[in-house]
From Swiss-Prot:
Pathway: Amino-acid biosynthesis; L-isoleucine biosynthesis; L-isoleucine from 2-oxobutanoate: step 2/4; Amino-acid biosynthesis; L-valine biosynthesis; L-valine from pyruvate: step 2/4. GO terms for cellular component: cytosol. This is Ketol-acid reductoisomerase (NADP(+)). The keyword Transmembrane helix does not apply. Its cofactor is Mg(2+). Involved in the biosynthesis of branched-chain amino acids (BCAA). Catalyzes an alkyl-migration followed by a ketol-acid reduction of (S)-2-acetolactate (S2AL) to yield (R)-2,3-dihydroxy-isovalerate. In the isomerase reaction, S2AL is rearranged via a Mg-dependent methyl migration to produce 3-hydroxy-3-methyl-2-ketobutyrate (HMKB). In the reductase reaction, this 2-ketoacid undergoes a metal-dependent reduction by NADPH to yield (R)-2,3-dihydroxy-isovalerate. Residues 209-344, 345-487 form the KARI C-terminal knotted domain. Mg(2+) 1 binds at D217, E221. It comes from Aliivibrio salmonicida (strain LFI1238) (Vibrio salmonicida (strain LFI1238)).
Length: 494
């Protein structure tokens, strides 16, 4: 197999990268009806598999789970997830031939083997579904020409897919149809019905492409979503400990601080997050973030270049073939970092203190969001995709750090995201440690600016505010958050 993206000419590549349209709620007026009366079989029952299946069943769809016979015989966790929730569970051979829609929700590294196994069992004219297009775009999987291939990609971990559905809402979702596999012209009808079955239409769906989803998803998760949180946690903790700050306080400020500052980001973008700081702290955070952007821009651009060229994917797949020796080694090293092992305590930090004493964290978030967004849009990815894969998902990932530090983040994200995270953090951590952290003090991480005057230069403050608010990520963010608010009003009202 060869990388699908590389088989496209430049015009086709740019067209696929630039596919992203926010879909009107009226386009989902029939909700999941197109799939009602049809047989949906999900392969794999991890977080995405189970929670998408629960939502689809509650939306009136007929859902079953196909697992390997060994997983059934040994009653592995995937079998327990499905059977304990009352789903029919059976082997590939029993369920796949009956399926109208087969949804592959196994880990990325298993996709080739799974698809090569299930494809001969699928009936003529059936549909194969993905929630991440890596297998199609990066591995170049060729699908039988009579099969339709679609994607529904919720922009959050599987647990949130379920929780938002139970609240009567959903999560923003990218949907796509593989242009090489839509023989009956029904791909979009199937994708829309599947998305509606998960509740995604209530939060807003983006009409995208397999290429745009994969390239933007890889970039976001490697850099701002995971890599920057990991590198930032490690170097900020080291700084505070070296300067005499209590280990429990330093660890808690970081573990729960990322979640707190990005919660502000979720509601009002970078502008609102920065507005949570005092005026002197805002100017300080702005200056720090500008320095960080200058320092880290080459690294962000390298990751984007390696994703576009396919170098990242080929490197990771080589590690798959080598029994994940690099991935597992980096995972172990992360578990041994000082931040991961800081002592627990009953200490409580007031919400505003996370901002006041975490000025550098705010600066890192602003720098990381803007750098990731800029790298993506400069490569042909449109603003909407870049927003969802940078700013929008960051609070969701920060929440996993709050639960169980970096370990939880790396468990919840895919192996693909985890591998990319380590690639980024392994370079970003020493870069920050050597070139940036010696230039800052605990007034920006750990202790705060203290009892200083709030007086600032008015012209400087105006310049800072205008620069923050006029970044393209703020314009598209305000527009998309507005759509989501409107969608939620309609969903709740309905």
């Amino acid at each position: 197999m060869s990388n699908y993206f590389d088989t496209l000419n430049l015009r086709e590549q740019l067209d696929q990268l630039g596919r992203c349209r926010f879909m009107d709620r009226e386009e989902f007026s029939t909700e999941a009806d197109y799939l009602k009366g049809k047989r949906v079989v999900i392969v794999g029952c991890g977080a995405q598999g189970l929670n998408q299946g629960l939502n689809m069943r509650d939306s009136g769809l007929n859902v079953a789970y196909a697992l390997r016979q060994a997983a059934i015989d040994e009653q592995r966790q995937s079998f327990k997830n499905a059977s304990e929730n009352g789903f029919e569970v059976a082997s590939y051979e029993k369920l796949i031939p009956q399926a109208d829609l087969v949804i592959n929700l196994t880990p990325d590294k298993q996709h080739t083997n799974v698809v090569e196994t299930v494809m001969p069992l699928m009936k003529e004219g059936a549909t194969l579904g993905y929630s991440h297009g890596f297998n199609i775009v990066e591995e170049g999987m060729k699908i039988r020409k009579d099969l339709t291939v679609v994607m529904v990609a919720p922009k959050c971990p599987g647990t949130e897919v379920r929780e938002e559905y139970k609240r009567g809402f959903g999560v923003p979702t990218l949907i796509a149809v593989h242009p090489e596999n839509d023989p009956k012209g029904e791909g979009w009808d199937i994708a829309k019905a599947w998305a509606a079955g998960t509740g995604g239409h209530r939060a807003g769906c983006l009409e995208s492409s397999f290429v745009a989803e994969v390239k933007s998803d890889l970039m976001g998760e490697q850099t701002i979503l995971c890599g920057m949180l990991q590198a930032g946690s490690i170097v900020c903790y080291e700084k505070m400990i070296a300067d005499g700050i209590d280990a429990s306080y330093a660890g808690k400020l970081l573990q729960f601080g990322w979640e707190t500052v990005t919660e502000a980001l979720k509601f009002g973008g970078v502008t609102h997050m920065m507005d949570r700081l005092s005026n002197p702290a805002k100017i300080k955070a702005f200056d720090l973030s500008e320095e960080l952007k200058d320092l880290m821009r080459p690294l962000y651009n390298k990751h984007m270049d390696d994703i576009i060229s396919g170098h990242f994917s080929s490197t990771m797949m080589a590690d798959w073939a080598n029994d994940d020796v690099n991935l597992l080694g980096w995972r172990e090293e992360t578990g041994e970092t000082a931040f991961e092992n800081y002592p627990d305590s009953s200490l409580e930090i007031p919400e505003q203190e996370y901002f006041d004493n975490g000025i550098l964290m705010v600066a890192m978030v602003r720098a990381g969001v803007e750098l990731a967004f800029e790298a993506m849009t400069a490569s042909g990815i449109v603003d909407e995709s870049a927003y969802y894969e940078s700013l929008h998902e960051l609070p969701l990932i920060a929440n996993t750090v709050a639960r169980k530090r970096l370990y939880e983040m790396n468990v919840v994200i895919s192996d693909t995201a985890e591998y990319g995270n380590y690639l980024f953090a392994n370079v970003a951590t020493p870069l920050l440690r050597e070139k940036f952290m010696p230039l800052v003090d605990t007034d920006v991480i750990g202790r705060g600016l203290g009892a200083i005057s709030n007086q600032v230069d008015n012209a400087k403050l105006i310049e800072v505010n205008e620069t923050i608010r006029n970044h393209p990520v703020e314009y598209i963010g305000e527009e998309l958050r507005g759509y989501m608010t409107d969608m939620k009003t309609i969903a709740v009202g309905g």
